[in-house]
Amino acid sequence: MDMRKLIVLTGTAILAACGGGSGDEQTVSFDNWQETEVVYSYPFDGQAEVSPNAPVVVRFSDPVEVDASNFTLTGPDGSVSFSVRGADQGRSAVLMPDSALAVKSEYALTLNNIRTDSGEAAIPDGSVDFKTRAALEGKPRALRQLSDSFGVASVSPDGDDLPFLDFSSVNLVMTQPLDRQTVVYGDTVTLTQDGETVPAYLRVDGRHISIDPQNELSSGSDVTLELSNGVQNLYGEELAGGFTRTFSPRNTKPRVTLVQEAAPADPVLGCLDEGVRTSPITGDPINCVPLIAKLLGDNTVSKQQGNVFAELAFAPNFPDKTPLRVPKGSLLKGDPLDVRIGGEVPAGFDSGEVTVTFLGDANGYLLPNPYSDDPSAPKQLRLTMDVAFDTEVQRANGAFNQTLLQVELVGYAIADTEKGSLIVDAVGVVEPEVLGTETAYGVLSFHMESYPDQQNAPVMEVDRTSPELAAWQPGDHVNKQRPGDPIILNFSEPLDPTTVIEGDTLRVTADGAPVDFEYYLDGVSIVIQPQPPLQYNTGYQVQFTDGITDIAGNPALGET
């Protein structure tokens, strides 16, 4: 049998319980259902680290007529006021709180008297429960920490609820924000297998740590995660007693790759125009990245598109929870973002092409529907990814370029048997900083469809382009650089963090003498902080060599 045909059959078999529709473009057929049921929610029941700006969505097996009286959203201060709008002919109800939810708080959503000709819709456990994240930078410590003690809040995958795999990355959420300079792979943080340190990429931001092994782990041999007490929070406090967790990686082979298209909302129209394709979950334009902030206004949005190469684990070995991954280096590219001063006055330039790069393998799972045991209920999809967000125009990159860790998409997957395609719809929230002064937010309505003809589907492009220095700070404004300001190198694409080595591939001198410095990677940038900080009347030089590479291994064009 042709391998590409086998891929389609394998992918369809994974979702065979999901059914396929012949009516609406991306809905499951519920014609044989005996009663109306909830089939999806965002956030999912039990989800943590939810953005306070997130919508709350409930999706039903049938169209329903609802208003705010049919839902109760309860938080730490009692009932939350919100508005409701429908999507997909009434199959989805989107609740928008009148103001942002409280940080680090528990919320519960219940349904009230949603009656249809097919019965009353209900949530099996009575409510959808979720927790919001702690506050981000610029807020008091009490709001930025989940608890008064510094420790590990969660590890994913945990090996229980979600299986740990031979291609798993490890995502940790801490209770308090980290001092990133104390989180050093191979020193204060390690993964070991068979007594050897596993080569891995480490990414740190806020309360999040991502550990992405460079190579596949060996199945059948335990992997141990260790954090020493050398890991510190922003306030200089150590991780008392450290932290240890052991995993047993499961074999996901043989795998198949399913090529999916993330098509634009419209080939010609913009995301904010009438008539573009919308998400059945939210009713918003698909594959658009909106950014809402006081500095930007609420009309800043980029239309994204690209191909996603989803690698599926061997389904017979994972009948209930099927793992998948999207390889690092995957790209989504999009239209320019408008740059406005105060969200209103045009700045006279746009961002140029917007690129979203997968910094590591995005890990995900297709899970049994948590709300319905009907064989036609769609599978739940969870996908976690670390991405770099950058723009073509460097003047705009100062506002938008950054790394976003552990972005979580929650959706569902169905099999359209008439098209011969697997269809994914998902929702997530991104919260990038704008100019380092404000946290913007955007609700992503992600949509992908596998190519029906996998034999002739696109192949993943090989990156053979070397990263170049696109801009740097202070650049031509050296006389405006203040003591204590960082030196920032902006490259044309994200870099491999393991190749940026202080005193080797990256050097800083002051009046010709080497100086110590701290640094971190953010998006396509290296942010350098000399130790001691920049001094008046001192000539500094920064040099990087071709030992620095992009995430595909292409060497940089060295420069001083």
What are the roles of these predicted feature ranges?
Residues 2-9:
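Sec-dependent signal peptide recognition
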Residues 15-17:
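C-terminal motif of bacterial Sec signal peptides marking the signal peptidase cleavage site
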Residues 19-72, 106-108, 112, 119-188, ...:
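N-terminal non-catalytic regions of secreted/periplasmic and cell-surface proteins
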Residues 60, 105-114, 174, 221-227, ...:
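Short beta-strand segments enriched for Tyr within beta-sheet-rich domains
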Residues 99-105, 215-221, 532-538:
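Surface-exposed, short loops/turns at beta-strand junctions within beta-sandwich domains
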Residues 116-127, 233-244, 396-400, 435-443, ...:
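Beta-sandwich strand segments
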Residues 182, 251-468, 477-479:
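Extracytosolic secretory-pathway proteins
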